Amino acid sequence: YKVSFKKIIHILKKLNKIKVHVVGDVIVDTHSKTSFIGGQTKTPTFSVLYGGKDDYVGGAGIVAKHLSAAGAKVTFTTVLGDDLLSKYVVKSFKNTKINLTAIVDKARPTTNKNVIVTDDYRLLKIDKLDNTIISKEICNKISKSIKKTKVDSVIFSDFRHGIFNKLTIKELSGSINNKVFKVADSQVATRWGNISEFKYFDLITPNEKEARFTLADQDSSIGNLAKKIQEITKSKLLILKLGERGALCVEQSKKNMAFNIGSFVENVVDPVGAGDALLAYSTLIYLKTKSLVYSGIIGSLAASIACEVDGNLPIKKSQILAKIDQIEKLLNLK
């Protein structure tokens, strides 16, 4: 398959008219900065001095922001608590072109994951959340939002904080127009997500751990793992994320194409959120090109940039273009 830097650059400049609806759990990622003071002599307790914090919109929220940064016209539907963090989330979308539908659930807090950091070491994470299933009323509101929004693609970004479960996935999936490109990603880093619950989607992007968790399979080769995941989900396209080993891309078609893409990461600073960048850009590129090759490559480039910065920030097209320029120079092609 012939791939050129010129074609990648051309594709990146043509993403402005794509309409995408992101549905999923928003997370406020907090980095609390501290300095180490010392430890107690009587108990195994260490002491740190608080030095401030940075908040980032993560989860499905950053997926929406990646898409917008790429030039797509984005609608984002999520559930928030009735608290200060929900106001922060809403405010963070005010200066963007994203159409936010924030459904307030007074029975739950806005999901917050607070990492305590000392000298770039992550000492502890404190979560504030409620993973109980959303009410039928809220599910109906999300369903109506999906039905009324005319888009090219719907992305379900599942972090298992209430929106998606066995009951709601069926209803919400059924609300998507059959002509719309359906994408799903389900996180199980510390939760109980299950990508196999998203049936007949066009593209799914689990990582290796999520795939093995879904299948209860720690022994199969990567190739067999990918095959089993596609068989159980009936998905057309699969990008299986392999961390520092890159990604395996599989297309179930007449060609039954499968190929590996190596990692483009040079210096890992913060890998959290890399999969969200891949999810966003891979979706847009496939919609534009119908090529899983370019979708996988550009998605992996976006993920590598996300790994090389601290905090969960939207990846811009200009950053990917700069990365491509850097790679061209390393290969002595420029």
Where are these predicted regions, by residue range?
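Conserved phosphate/ATP/ADP-binding segment of small-molecule kinases
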Residues: 153, 166-258
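Short glycine/proline- and charge-enriched loop/turn segments
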Residues: 38-49, 203-207, 257-264
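Conserved post-catalytic alpha-helical subdomain immediately downstream of the catalytic base
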Residues: 234-236, 264-328
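Short acidic loop-to-helix transition motifs that present clustered carboxylates
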Residues: 85, 109, 161, 186-192
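Flexible inter-domain linker/hinge segments
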Residues: 1-11
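Active-site metal-binding loops of divalent metal-dependent hydrolases
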Residues: 25-26, 159, 277
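Short acidic, glycine-rich surface-loop motifs adjacent to enzyme active sites
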Residues: 151-165
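Conserved N-terminal subdomain of the carbohydrate kinase-like
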Residues: 17-20, 28-155, 173, 178, ...
